Amino acid sequence: MQPYKIQELEKCGLFSKLFGSTPTENGWKELNNLLAQAQDVASISADDVHSALKKWGVKFNEENLPRRAALYRQLADVSFTDAQTSDDPLFAQLKRLAELLELHENQVKLADKSARTAAYFQRCRRILSNEEKLDINSINELFGYDYEDGLAIRKQVFQAHFNLLFEDIVKEARYSPEQEAGFRKDCERLDIPYEFKNNIVSALNKYRSLWDAENRKLEPLDIDLPLEKGEVCYVHVNCGLCQNKVVEREDNYFELTRKFNIDETVNFKGEKLEHPKIKEEITALLELGHFFLTNTRIIYLSQKQALAKRLDDLTGADFDGINIVTFHDKDKQEHLLKFPDEAAGVVYILFKRVKNKEI
């Protein structure tokens, strides 16, 4: 009978039977084996139970109540995990086993509650893996749960399921409509809302934008900007014009001495000390403006200047993976533009599509 499995009895001599702990342990193994060999609980009598224990000098008492409750819990786990209806024979066996083990009513309630919770977790997981025969409403009815009773568990099961799949989404940095539809269906099957924490929502929105940039058909935008005949705009976004510069700064040690007001500017002879300088390359933001991507040009406009480059005059672009796209032209000039974090990757993908005429 499930879930019990035959256990091998420990060998012991006469004196260990009389004075040792092994007989007690063998008594519980004997009872376990009785349950394992039976077709069902109904085929076992109270005399069978006591006889199995008696040969090892074991009797029911308050001290071994936890051992009996543990045996009951094993069947309770199976019953609540596999039962299909409230009058399922598994529950009748469970009730009979409680009588055979002479469990107190409160012990039965505690074991049932724990088994019910564990089974609810498992059956919710089986719903998501398409292994469960009942839907969530039928399981709630079987367990005597209302909507709120199992809501926290259902959310927890979905979150664990989502986290595993989210790792692949992050790795690919893409979130397709099919993936979203799958998650929404999972939430529907568990009867929970489709919702995430703000940081997850932001990440999913970013990955969806990248997926759209690669797969959606490009639609022209209406913009207040004079374009050439036959020219249409596909992207308009705020940006910043940047430039790579080499700057000098003081060594970190001397910056630290100034921070703590340590005077090291004068030596013992009264001569001023020159702090060592370190040169480093930085990407400096020069000004803010607007970026436009059309079917023939990239355009940058600000209050101070305008820059337009034909796509045919550009050899390509690089993306730093964060927010800067560098456009390279045939004159070996670089045009660095800084975009909002959520837009930079999209601009880079759309530029490549438009330049390669994959519209």
Positions of PLM-derived features:
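Acidic, Ser/Thr- and proline-rich intrinsically disordered linker/docking segments
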Residues: E287, F292, I299, Q303-I359
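Acidic surface patches and DE-rich sequence motifs
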Residues: T265-N267, T294, D329
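Eukaryotic alpha-helical scaffold "rod" segments
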Residues: E30-D40, R249-G270, D341-I359
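A short, charged
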Residues: K133, P226, G270, L337-P340
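Anionic N-terminal interaction surfaces
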Residues: I192-H290
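Amphipathic alpha-helical protein-interaction segments
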Residues: M1-L210, F291
